């Protein structure tokens, strides 16, 4: 589980180009401007390619994916 969490955080950090996602797992990704709609598409592609977890853009709800902790939780539910 810890390895999965680290993989998710690594992907988030790369796509967001901001290491705060590893330092503060409750940072508001959208409210703080760390993640935008373009980055969401890149993020979902990375999750599919690197973690083999497919998330449809239509299933993506900003409120459920608002923080790094929430992203990890949602991906754990899906996989």
From Swiss-Prot:
Pathway per the UniProt entry: Cell wall biogenesis; lipoteichoic acid biosynthesis
PTM annotation: 4'-phosphopantetheine is transferred from CoA to a specific serine of apo-DCP.
Gene: dltC
Compartments, record wording: Cytoplasm
Family of the protein in this entry: Belongs to the DltC family.
Main location: cytoplasm
Protein function: Carrier protein involved in the D-alanylation of lipoteichoic acid (LTA). The loading of thioester-linked D-alanine onto DltC is catalyzed by D-alanine--D-alanyl carrier protein ligase DltA. The DltC-carried D-alanyl group is further transferred to cell membrane phosphatidylglycerol (PG) by forming an ester bond, probably catalyzed by DltD. D-alanylation of LTA plays an important role in modulating the properties of the cell wall in Gram-positive bacteria, influencing the net charge of the cell wall.
Gene Ontology cellular-component annotations: cytoplasm
InterPro entries: ACP-like_sf, DltC, PP-bd_ACP
Protein name: D-alanyl carrier protein
NCBIfam families: dltC, PRK05087.1
Positions carrying O-(pantetheine 4'-phosphoryl)serine: 37
Keyword tags: Cell wall biogenesis/degradation, Cytoplasm, Phosphopantetheine, Phosphoprotein
GO BP terms: cell wall organization; lipoteichoic acid biosynthetic process
Domain Carrier per the UniProt entry, residue ranges: 2-79
Pfam families: PP-binding
Alphabetical list of SUPFAM superfamilies matching this protein: ACP-like
